A protein has these predicted regions:
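Secretory pathway targeting signatures of secreted, lumenal, and periplasmic proteins
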Residues: 46-100
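Surface-exposed amphipathic alpha-helical segments
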Residues: 154-187
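Second-shell loop/turn segments in exported
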Residues: 80-89, 140-141, 163-171
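Bacterial N-terminal signal peptides that target proteins for export
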Residues: 1-9
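Signature of long, low-cysteine stretches enriched in small and polar/charged residues
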Residues: 99-154
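Bacterial lipoprotein signal-peptidase II cleavage site
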Residues: 22-28
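Post-signal peptide N-terminal segment of mature Sec-exported envelope proteins
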Residues: 29-49
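C-terminal motif of bacterial Sec signal peptides marking the signal peptidase cleavage site
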Residues: 17-20
Length: 187
């Protein structure tokens, strides 16, 4: 074998040896976004409207006309919209409209879980909806005494609906909405 060939093979082997001495490349482990929210502290909300409820002290509430409210969660980019309507013999229409609003999300929803709500002592009856999937809203409810008062609530996020991404915030706010419904009282 000529000297040039031996030298060439030796240089290639030496180069391969030097290049192969790098640290072993390991795949990057998958990571998960960790979102920690403070433990909810609830305060009583009072207004001139014919109902009261408890809400998260970290949320910001703004009054709208006709006893409608927005409860904002700026850190989560979410808002609960509360709407009040007096019942004027049109309870069936109000119920139909509230249910229709929820089921408009069937196209994007993976599942809609209905949870009836009954509080006979306070005369508050309603339904809580948990909407799973990439729907515009993840939680909604309606509550009524069936003779005078009707309240609806729904949460919306200011982000493209991607349930996996907003699930921690959606779960946190869902708990706040359930607390609101459970503490709702008519005046």
């Amino acid at each position: 074998m000529p000297k040039k060939t031996i030298l060439f093979i030796t240089l290639i082997l030496l180069a391969l040896t030097v290049l192969s001495c790098k640290k072993e490349v390991l795949p990057k482990p998958s990571s998960h976004l960790r979102l920690d929210y403070p433990e909810a502290n609830y305060v009583q909300f009072e207004s001139q409207c014919p109902f009261t409820f408890e809400m998260n002290a970290d949320a910001i509430i703004k009054g709208e006309k006709e006893c409608g409210f927005t409860i904002s969660y700026p850190k989560m980019k979410a808002t609960i919209y509360l709407t009040y309507k007096p019942v004027n013999g049109d309870i069936n229409k109000l119920l139909r409209d509230a249910q229709k609003l929820t089921y408009e999300h069937v196209i994007k929803a993976d599942d809609i879980l209905e949870q009836p709500f009954l509080n006979p002592q306070q005369k508050v009856f309603g339904m809580f909806y948990q909407v799973d999937g990439n729907a515009a809203t993840n939680s909604q409810f309606y509550a009524t005494d069936s003779t005078k008062h009707f309240v609806t609530g729904s949460v919306y996020f200011y982000a493209k609906p991607n349930f996996d991404s907003i699930m921690p915030a959606a779960s946190y706010i869902k708990n706040d909405m359930q607390r609101l419904l459970e503490t709702l009282k008519w005046k």
